[in-house]
C-alpha cells in the first residue's frame, strides 16, 4: 500500500496524547472531501509551499487516482492520537523522513470502501499541510505480545545492545527478520533475529539478502567517483555532454548536483505511474526516462542549489554513467563495485532469482512483491547482505582507496551537524564523524553507519519497512563508544 501515495517529511514519534487539534480536523475533513470528489488540484492547494516544491502535482494526482481506483472513497475518519516529535531521522526510498522542522502531527484511521489506512498529518502555522502519509494500520498489540528469546552465546552484543535490538524488533510482525553487522576497530561480527509465533529469537542470516533501498545511491556515487579518477567525466561536468539528444529547454544538469541532491529535480519523474515499481511487465523503462528528459524535465529554480532529496536525480546519474560505459546496470555495478569488493551475493538486477532473498513484509506481515525500478535502479534496486555490506564498509578504512575517499568528501552543507558527500550523509557526532545512508522500500528498510577514523560501523537490514531501523542504527553506533 506504500506505493499508492507519497510519504513525505515524516518525523519520528516520542510523545503521544489523545487531544485532537480542531484546526487539523478541519484540514483533514477538507482533504477527504476533495479526495472523494476527485479534486486533486484542490488537495494540492492544501499543501505548504515547501511540500509543493518537493512533490510535483502530477505525482500527487497520479498517486491519489491510483488510491481511489484501488480502495475507493473514504467512508469514515476517526482520530487516533496526537504526536510530538523528538528527533530527526534520515531515511530514503520510497519514503523520505527528513525532519527539517520539528512539527507535531496527528493520526487518523481512514476507512475506505475496500480497506482501512492510517493517515498521519502535520500542518504549519498557516494551516497548510507540511507532513502527510498514508500507510497500513499497524497491529498495536505486536509490542505487548513480543517475547524476548534473544541469546548471544558468542558475546557478539552487550546487554545494552540486546535491549536496544529487542526494543526495535518487537514492532516486527511474525516472519520479520533483522540482520546486523558490527564493525569494531576493523573487526566484523554478525548477529541476526527472527520473529516466529511472537517469539523473537537469535537467527543466523548474515548471508541472506534484502533490498537495501537507497544505500544503493552510495554505490552509484562510487561509480561516478571512479569515472572521475579515470578521466571519463569531470566532477562538475554536465550530463548534457554525454547524452545523444537535447535535454528539455537545454537545462544544464551537473553530475555533482545529481549526487548530492541539489539539482532542482523533483523526487520522481512526472511520467512514472504508481504501478510501475511493482509489476515486472510494467516497469519504468529507459525509454520512459528518455522521453521524460527530452519532453518533460523541469528544473525548479527555487530549489536548485539547495538540498531536495531526489530519487530521480541519482537514478538519472546512474543511467548516464551506464550510457558512457555502454553497458547495462548489472555489468556496470558488478565491474566497479560488487566484483571489486568480493560482494558475491549482491546484485542490482532485481529480476534475478535468489534463494538467499528474504521476502519483504508489510507492517502487518503480508508478503510484498519486490521492487522493479528498471531505469531508476541506480536509486534503490540493489539487493545485498550484511556480510557483503560489511566488506564494503571495511574497504572505507583503506586510505589508499581514492574512489572511496572521493565519495566521502563534503560537497554540500545541510546544517551544522549534517553535510553531504557524493552519496554519503556526513554526520557530526560529538568528537566523531560518521558516514551514513539509510534505505526504505516497500517491505524492507536498512541503515549503514561508518566511522572511518575509529574503524567502527553498524549495518542493519530488515525485511519490513519500519521507521525504527534508522533510529536503531544510530543508537547502536553510539553504543560502540
List each language-model region with its residue ranges.
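Bacterial Sec-dependent N-terminal signal peptides
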Residues: 1-23
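Short, low-complexity N-terminal intrinsically disordered segments enriched in polar/charged residues
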Residues: 15-39, 45, 147-156
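Surface-exposed, charged secondary-structure patches
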Residues: 65-120
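Short beta-strand edge/turn micro-motifs at domain boundaries
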Residues: 114-146
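Short, well-ordered beta-strand elements
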Residues: 119-120, 130-134, 437, 446-464
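Short, conserved catalytic-motif segment at the N-terminal edge
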Residues: 153-210, 232-237, 291-294
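Short active-site loop at a secondary-structure junction
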Residues: 174-179, 200-257, 299-312, 377-380, ...
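Short, surface-exposed loop or secondary-structure junction motifs
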Residues: 251-442, 446
